[in-house]
Every structure is written in C-alpha cells, then in structure tokens.
C-alpha cells in the first residue's frame, strides 16, 4: 500500500517588506534655471549639473559643484563648442 503525502513548504524567512523598503533620496533639482535668450543678473545660476555636461563660455563661471553662474548681467546664449560639447555664455545687453 502506497501512502500519498502532501507537503506544504513555508518561507524560512519573512518577505522583505516594509522594513527594508521605503527609502528614497530627495530630488536635487538639476538642469537649466535660465533658458536661451533670457536676461540674467550677475551671480544668478544658469545651469545646475553633476559633472560638466555644459561648459562655461564668455562671462560664465563654474562653481565647485559644477554649477554655471553669470559673472555679469546680460542675455543667455547656449552654443555648440568643438565636437559635441555645449557651452553657455552671457553677452551684455
């Protein structure tokens, strides 16, 4: 006579649910703060970035965290540098 057994396997560990999930960092609000053709005041932030996605052109400074800012008041102009590089410049009005 053969016996038929049904075995139910249970999880040896709890499902890694609510205690291990639920963390996320706040967004860093990167990107363009002023567009092409807009007027910038001296010291205003033009572009926030991580690394040099866009390079500084005329009258534009590069901050310690690679933020681009206007050195003088003027009009913003996004331009192409040699190759595939992009730069942003500020021209006086």
Swiss-Prot record:
GO terms for cellular component: cytosolic large ribosomal subunit. Coiled coil: none annotated. Keywords: Ribonucleoprotein, Ribosomal protein. SUPFAM superfamilies: Ribosomal L27 protein-like. The keyword Flavoprotein does not apply. InterPro entries: Ribosomal_bL27, Ribosomal_bL27_CS. Residues 1-10 form a propeptide. One of its GO terms (biological process) is translation. One of its GO terms (molecular function) is structural constituent of ribosome. It holds the Pfam family Ribosomal_L27. The N-terminus is cleaved by ribosomal processing cysteine protease Prp. PANTHER family: LARGE RIBOSOMAL SUBUNIT PROTEIN BL27M (PTHR15893:SF0), RIBOSOMAL PROTEIN L27 (PTHR15893). Belongs to the bacterial ribosomal protein bL27 family. This is Large ribosomal subunit protein bL27.
């Amino acid at each position: 006579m053969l016996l038929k057994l049904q075995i139910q396997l249970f999880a040896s560990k709890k499902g890694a649910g609510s205690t291990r999930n639920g963390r996320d960092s706040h967004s860093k609000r990167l990107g363009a703060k002023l567009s092409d053709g807009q007027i910038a005041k001296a010291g205003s932030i033009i572009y926030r970035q991580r690394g040099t996605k866009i390079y500084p052109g005329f009258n534009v400074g590069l901050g310690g965290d690679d933020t681009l800012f206007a050195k003088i008041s003027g009009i913003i102009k996004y331009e192409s540098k040699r190759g595939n590089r992009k730069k942003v410049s500020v021209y006086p009005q």
